[in-house]
Amino acid sequence: MNPINYLYLSALLFTIGAAGVLLRRNAIVMFMCVELMLNAVNLAFVTFARMHGHLDGQMIAFFTMVVAACEVVIGLAIIMTIFRTRKSASVDDANLLKG
């Protein structure tokens, strides 16, 4: 398969994720869209690494996946805490910065 097709797929996935972040108000859905965007960037990194014959893109994708796994753990813990206290996962309802 042509590597350009993978870049098109990566751009499509990133666009879907960005639209989800901008249009949805549920924190869990927004979180999943951010993860979709990270995976799209990983796909682009691996595709560029494959096109140029280097392993740099694959290493960056691996480290991005490690950081994303940590983000999932911390992000879901925060979202679950907000849901338990506010009984809603909407980002519009969570004004936790008020004193």
UniProtKB/Swiss-Prot annotation:
GO cellular component term, pick one: plasma membrane
Role this protein plays: NDH-1 shuttles electrons from NADH, via FMN and iron-sulfur (Fe-S) centers, to quinones in the respiratory chain. The immediate electron acceptor for the enzyme in this species is believed to be a menaquinone. Couples the redox reaction to proton translocation (for every two electrons transferred, four hydrogen ions are translocated across the cytoplasmic membrane), and thus conserves the redox energy in a proton gradient.
GO molecular function, one term: NADH:ubiquinone reductase (non-electrogenic) activity
Family listed: Belongs to the complex I subunit 4L family.
Oligomeric and partner information: NDH-1 is composed of 14 different subunits. Subunits NuoA, H, J, K, L, M, N constitute the membrane sector of the complex.
Domain of life (superkingdom): Bacteria
InterPro entries noted in UniProt: NADH_UbQ_OxRdtase_chain4L/K, NUOK/Mnh_C1-like
Transmembrane segments: 3-23, 28-48, 59-79
GO aspect biological process, one term: ATP synthesis coupled electron transport
UniProt name for this protein: NADH-quinone oxidoreductase subunit K
Protein species of origin: Mycolicibacterium paratuberculosis (strain ATCC BAA-968 / K-10)
Alphabetical keyword list: Cell membrane, Membrane, NAD, Quinone, Translocase, Transmembrane, Transmembrane helix, Transport
Membrane topology reported for the UniProt record: Multi-pass membrane protein
Gene3D superfamilies documented for this protein: 1.10.287.3510
Subcellular location: Cell membrane
Recorded catalytic activity of this chain's protein: a quinone + NADH + 5 H(+)(in) = a quinol + NAD(+) + 4 H(+)(out)
Enzyme Commission (EC) number: 7.1.1.-
